[in-house]
């Protein structure tokens, strides 16, 4: 069947096509993972409910003619339906402008897929009349997104470096007769501070996307960077890129030392150990108990074993029980905590802390200013066109300086000339 060739669309429910679409677009084995699939599934489910009059204003009766008692089918879809849904998104739910645009794009992408699959004869959702009720662009400029400034980057990295140094020194200088549990508590504090330092330095200087670095619960392929993925000698790190393939990212000099000292302190039992494991006590307690039970340990023995450790993370290290990596949400929580303790001055309308993506954007600004768009695009793993678009505020400012310099050099009015008038 060629694209645009109609199926027997009257026999096809919208919901069944949505499931097929999500399988095609999903990531991971069986098409059951990925943020896109999750977000699209939510919005397409809302669209199907709206089409059947199960969602919407009280006087909304759905897209099926009033004299017919059945579920909506593709025969009921045309550009007027998508226009009405665009109006519903724009006015009935109080969504922000860019959110309305995003939600409509999920519906439009499904509509395009339906054309290719032969469910629909035309891409009704992309017609001008259908999109007319959508709000205009919210006017957000490329430079409006948070980017760590040099002062913020230095303040945060200096803060986490001092914390890690103090914690490691406190642990390594303990007297030999220190109580074993107290020594474990000191080691745990040193490990946590060293992990936080390594995470901040990686986010600040590598420009790697936080989603490429840490675990995404909705995408089984994004399990977080492991020690086997890192070569400190070569200064490289293998990450699963946004473009859905493995690629090497650079580790610049400022990142090497924090990672090396952190690894020495942790001494991971295997190379498959996550570089940034979770320190969440509830998660680790459940993991340790389940793993030891699977190994045949009795509940009483598990309890006794756990009582010998100040923290379950230390037990996991000794017993080679691999914890999960922290998630992207976990990284945000860490940076919120560190931004507060570092007392960093932050003036941004959306974030009152140094958000993970701001580290990448801050490094992007450094690279664009120092080496231009081509080099920055390679380091950021983006197209040069996209980098130019996202950092266009830099070029605009520099062109303004060039224009000012040109006016001063060529078009300035000599003081003598003004005196003659």
Would you name each region that the model predicts?
Residues 298-378, 385:
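Short, basic (Lys/Arg/His-rich) helix/loop patches that form interaction surfaces
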């Amino acid at each position: 069947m060629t694209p645009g060739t109609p199926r027997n669309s009257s026999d096809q429910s919208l919901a069944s096509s949505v499931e097929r679409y999500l399988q095609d677009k999903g990531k991971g084995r069986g098409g059951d993972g990925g943020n896109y699939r999750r977000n699209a599934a939510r919005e397409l489910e809302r669209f199907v409910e709206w089409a059947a009059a199960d969602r919407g204003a009280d006087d909304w009766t759905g897209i099926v003619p009033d004299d017919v008692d059945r579920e909506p089918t593709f025969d009921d879809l045309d550009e007027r339906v998508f226009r009405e849904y665009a109006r519903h998104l724009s006015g009935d739910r109080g969504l922000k402008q860019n959110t309305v645009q995003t939600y409509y794009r999920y519906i439009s992408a499904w509509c395009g897929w339906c054309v290719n699959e032969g469910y629909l004869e035309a891409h009704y959702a992309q017609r001008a009349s259908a999109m007319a009720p959508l709000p205009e662009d919210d006017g957000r400029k490329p430079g409006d997104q948070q980017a760590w400034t040099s002062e913020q980057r230095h303040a945060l990295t200096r803060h986490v470096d001092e914390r890690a140094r103090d914690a490691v020194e406190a642990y390594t200088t303990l007297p030999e007769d220190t109580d074993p549990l107290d020594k474990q508590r000191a080691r745990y504090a040193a490990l946590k501070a060293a992990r936080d330092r390594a995470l901040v330095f990686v986010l600040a200087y590598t420009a790697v996307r936080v989603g490429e670095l840490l675990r995404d619960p909705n995408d089984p392929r994004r399990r977080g960077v492991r020690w086997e993925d890192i070569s400190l000698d070569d200064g490289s790190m293998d990450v699963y890129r946004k473009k859905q393939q493995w690629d090497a990212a650079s580790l610049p000099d400022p990142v090497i030392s924090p990672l090396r000292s952190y690894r020495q302190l942790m001494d991971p039992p295997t190379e498959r150990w996550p570089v940034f494991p979770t320190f969440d006590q509830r998660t680790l307690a459940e993991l340790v108990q389940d793993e030891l039970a699977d190994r045949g340990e009795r509940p009483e023995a598990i309890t006794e074993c756990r009582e010998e450790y100040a923290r379950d993370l230390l037990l996991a290290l000794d017993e080679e029980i691999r914890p999960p990596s922290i998630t992207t949400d976990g990284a945000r929580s860490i940076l919120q905590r560190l931004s507060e303790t570092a007392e960093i001055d932050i003036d941004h309308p959306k974030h009152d802390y140094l958000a993970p993506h701001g580290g990448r954007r801050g490094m992007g600004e450094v690279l664009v200013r120092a080496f231009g768009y081509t080099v920055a695009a390679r380091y950021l793993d983006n197209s040069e066109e996209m980098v130019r678009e996202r950092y266009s505020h830099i070029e605009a400012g520099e062109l303004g300086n060039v224009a000012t310099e040109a006016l001063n050099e060529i078009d300035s009015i000599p003081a003598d000339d003004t005196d003659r008038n």
